[in-house]
Amino acid sequence: MRAVHLLLVLAIYITRTRSFNKESIKECAQVLSEHMKETFSKISHETILKQNYEKLVEEEQFDPRAELKRSKHRIEDYLKVRSQFAYKAKISLEARSVKNDTSVNDPQSKSFIRFMSAKQGNDGTTIYESNHLGKKLKVNETKSFNLTQNANFYTLPTSSVSSAVHIPTPLYDRNEELLRKIDWSDIDAVYRTNREETKDLAFQLFCSEAGYMRYYPAASWFWDNQDEHLDLFDCRNTEWYINSATNSKNVLIMLDMSGSMLGQRYEVAKQTTEAILETLSHNDYFNIMTFSKNTFLLDGCNGTNGLLQATMRNKKALRRKMDTYQSEGKAEYEKALPLAFSVLLDLKGSYALYTKEEMSMMSGNATNDYQFHLELPEHVLAATRQYIDSINNGGGDNNRGACENVIMLITDGAPNAYKKIFDMYNADKKVRVFTFLVGDEAIDFNEVREMACNNRGYMVHVANMADVDEKIHHYIRRMSRVVGRHYKESGQLSWWTGVYRERLYLPRPEVFAEPVPITNQSFAVMNKMASRRKIRLQKSEARSRMFVTTVSYPVIVNETFMGVAAVNIPLTEIAQKSHPANIGAKSYFFMLDQNGFVMTHPQLRPIDPVTKYHKQNYNNMDLLELEVGQNQNVRSSQKSQAVSDLVCESGANYAECVDDLRKAVRKMIIDCDNSDVQQLDVLYATELLDRVYPQTNTYYAECINHANFVLGLAVAKGDDYRIIKKQKKYDFGRVKMDWMGDKRWKLHPHWRYCFLNDTDTHMTKEEAFEIYAQQMSDSGKAPLLCEYRRNLVEKLLLDMEATSNLIDSWDTQYSYMKNNLIHLAFFSTPSGMIRYYNLTLQDYDYIDPYWSIFEHIGHLLSFEHAQESYNHFITDLNRKSTDDRYYRRAVRMKDTIMFDVSNNSKIWYKSETQLTGYGLNENLTMLGQAFKAIYLDKAVLGVSGYEFAFDHVVDTMAEHGCPASDDRKWCLLLDEHAYVFFSNQNDISYEDYLVGKGKHISQYFGGLNRIAQRAMALLVENKFYTKFTYTDNQAVCKAAKQVTLSAGRLRPFYHVFQFLMQTFNFMVRLASQVSGGYLIWLPNIQFTEAYTASFHEGTDVYPCPKQSSFYFSNKDGKNRPTSTHLVTGNRSERPCKMNAKCSVKIEAAFVDGTNLVMVWITQDKASENCYDESECSMDIPSAQVPFGFEEVKNDESCENLEKRKSKANDVCYSIDDDDSEVSVTNERRPCSLSPSSLVSIVPILVGFLHFYMF
């Protein structure tokens, strides 16, 4: 009972504190410190741990350069193997030829082609006759995927029976040409052999230029909308396909916004623009120009900085701006085309356009600066000699290294082909022109076709929204001819993508059995359901954040580009080749892609915690956007004589200086130059962005050969120490099963220690390692499947041996733990192992005893109605050791016991009459944790900690001068960031806290009320806390809804149009039934505002920097306060502007050895209404101690933006011999779709008009 606990606490302190003055905050804090340190010492067994480790390991100061090189070579070897597998697939495909069978759709023929459909999960199909009858034939399946959880795919259900084939929604899956190519690409034997060679080989892929994707092993398809089976994916839009299929591109999209581009035409134009943007990768650069009577470039600088890198951040930003423009006036091609060429080619010099009337009225010398004149139908173009020379020389140097220049014209027609303009700017045909004629009724084909055909391009007619996806890919096919023609130049050249979220790994929606009503017998069923769901969620966590990079090769047969063979590599696997266990606990590895964007970094937060969708800028973050400066001061050299000259000082040129220095740091890392390593004073933030820790990092970098990646290492000051085994060679024969016999240990769920067989999903990671440990003990050597991660396995075995007697040590403290309401102790190690000890407190239940089955009878059986239970701090909430929040906090505050309180776990009182520590009649208690990093001199051994019922804190504070009471004497414990760990106000409710409505606990102290606000200001002023400003460059903001609608004049008629389309749809369906069902396969999916996959999610938010002030404890600082009085002379403070009677004294003292600060706020006897907000309101916003993230409104600078060049663009295939009409076999190649081609896809267009509109 709690009464017994109170008596025990009382007895302990009577002897310890006889001379203890409870009216002195200094003495209270000192005695509390001694108690907390003693408790932690008894629970952690720190001395025993150090003695155990000293027998096995020793401290080593490592060389960061040498460790980085070792990691670099491991990663290179790992990537090389994956690259070879993709290359084997390429060679195998190129050795095959496409058969010319004509009976591929005849089930009775030997040539009938089946394939395993990713969407159906089997090889069954439905065939429609290509005639007016539309007769359909259903072909039954002969094989289906038997999907089982795969241990090597993070428990994703897969099948090795066959590869799966995905076909985009707009394509008919029984098209004969498509089927022949699907059959040609069946290289499952190669995929299977590759998979058998390497257990951790991820998905092997092939994307055909025809649109289908083959992947192995098979897995169920991830739908964009599961309920409606919405599928927006097309592998031809992926970065790995685009990179291999085309040269890198500078693209200018010209969007006709003339008065005729109204209603449906503009909607089609917008979708066409999105589809083009979808096909641009980070190796490409782009801008969008709208033109009518005026021309506008949609970037914030109106084109003055040329082209933007084709990141999702930039693409969505410009796409949003399209919605602010309206159709109006005439399309002024004579204004738009010269500007397009000028921006695209970065032309130097200047030009001017004059109407012929203006030209005739000008004096002879008015245009002396413009020596060149070109007469156009409506204008005269006058240009300077420099401008003409720039054209003749191929443009400026603003092409950012991309290989080809491309103009994409989206229009409903052009009055002229403007041959003079193209002859002037593009005489050598170096700029490709692709034209997209939009609208059902568009008839002006000739002019736009001539523009494309005369400039190495292609013209397509995009009749409606259903027409877009497939038509866009004609430009990719056109540009891929160059790759096919120059296949000998590519050799074994591989292409690597940046980071992206692989959809094949994403968790599928949970499918439950047919729902049944809850009965009195459902109790056990529901609890078992909830338990299994918890396990499923733990296993799928890694997959939900699965980001990959992909290596790809173009597949070329007879100089014809056929597609791209690829293998993707999960970044979590690459990260284990540069393992955090090999360096200091505060230091970290990071990786940059070929564009200098961050791939892996502990500060990268790619998932929006609200939407669970990846952020727009998740794969285009700059390193220095994550390495957030402490005070924007930067040191770019460790050379002492240079530092003083390089540190920026406040003044007019401060911002410019900081920018230059940060660019110097970035350049050093990109260039992998370790001759003069760089330093930055940064703030390291926790994942939830509620805490930041200052540290000084030194940066090192190594280039990853072949992949063009950069591996970096940030070593925190004083953190270049680690532990190593004393014996050079580990003796596996000394492994004892007793080390793991108690079963109370866990391994990092996302790290591989020893490889498993695909089918080993019935066992846990811990059970699997026990099997391998037994083999080690029996054979005296490491099993083959453990050799790949031998270094980590040896570290794990050392940690197991050193901590093997911890359970016995914890047993000796059973009574002490029980008396102090401690029910869990743990020790986490850098190897990813966590050893823990459970103790069940007698007065508490770990499953909600007040839950009743009868309250849920009548509902459908669901885990939502299951009995609530305790969330174990280790096994349920924190299994990732060094990657867990508490671990990262502990190692950043050396020699400090960290105290925290959790709102995601609780335990229940057994007695209904038991009161909380605050005296309230509630049936549960919160839980708190204490943890601390354990060191062997300067090297981290791990983090030790324990969990306790929060009642113990309330009872303990009552014996240290802070009993639960009213607000006359307000006593608090603040943590290292001024969050409230304890408050003695007696109306604090555990139940309210656990549902997010609590008072004081875990809240920022300075935001509680006016008294706390003033006290916080005094704490900062007296150096108890240091103020920092943190900028979150990964934040997102909600986009304001656009009130300006495009093509607004047709909006009143939208419902009429919708009625007509619904009527048309009904007639199509009726015709389908009459004709035997030929059109039945057409999708019946509701209208969706998003057109393409990338723009389907996250359209209502945009990236924006946000800033917040943080306050960090100065307990070890040079200016640590010596007085406990926050006001000189211990005078009273009157913080209320509207209440002169409020008078308080404020004191503070560090609780040494912990992260806590004790604060007392005592009201004078005559003081009144200090906490009445109507008489003592807060300063909002607070000028002295602001807190909370707010958007940073930066003025968009349009000068000297950094020109980022991709390392991937070093390879360019020449287009000089690329003729748009004649192939290498002297066949005529059209530069536009023929009318017959248009007629052949009419049924598809009709169906997909319904798909996109309703």
UniProtKB/Swiss-Prot annotation:
Topological type in the membrane: Single-pass type I membrane protein
Extracellular side: 20-1233
Single GO cellular component term: voltage-gated calcium channel complex
Gene3D superfamilies, per the entry: PAS domain, von Willebrand factor, type A domain
Pfam families (UniProt xref): VWA_2 (PF13519), VWA_N (PF08399)
Main location: membrane
Single GO MF descriptor: voltage-gated calcium channel activity
InterPro entries associated with the record: Ca_channel_alpha-2/delta (IPR051173), VWA_N (IPR013608), VWF_A (IPR002035), vWFA_dom_sf (IPR036465)
Keywords attached to this entry: Calcium, Calcium channel, Calcium transport, Glycoprotein, Ion channel, Ion transport, Membrane, Signal, Transmembrane, Transmembrane helix, Transport, Voltage-gated channel
Signal peptide from the UniProt entry: 1-19
Coiled coil regions, renumbered to chain: none
Positions annotated with a glycan in the UniProt record: N100, N140, N146, N302, N365, N520, N558, N757, N838, N903, N923, N1130
UniProt subcellular location: Membrane
SMART domains, A to Z: VWA
PROSITE patterns, per the entry: VWFA
Residue ranges of domain VWFA in the record: 250-479
GO BP field: egg-laying behavior; locomotion; nematode pharyngeal pumping; serotonin receptor signaling pathway
Function, in words: May act as an auxiliary subunit of the unc-2 voltage-gated calcium channel which appears to trigger calcium-activated signaling pathways that control the serotonin response. Inhibiting serotonin sensitivity of the vulval muscles results in egg laying defects. May act in both neurons and muscle cells to enhance motor activity as it is required for coordinated movement. Has a role in neural depolarization-induced calcium influx and pharyngeal pumping. Involved in restricting the expression of the putative olfactory receptor str-2 to only one of the two AWC neurons.
Protein name (database record): Voltage-dependent calcium channel unc-36
Species classification: Eukaryota, Metazoa, Ecdysozoa, Nematoda, Chromadorea
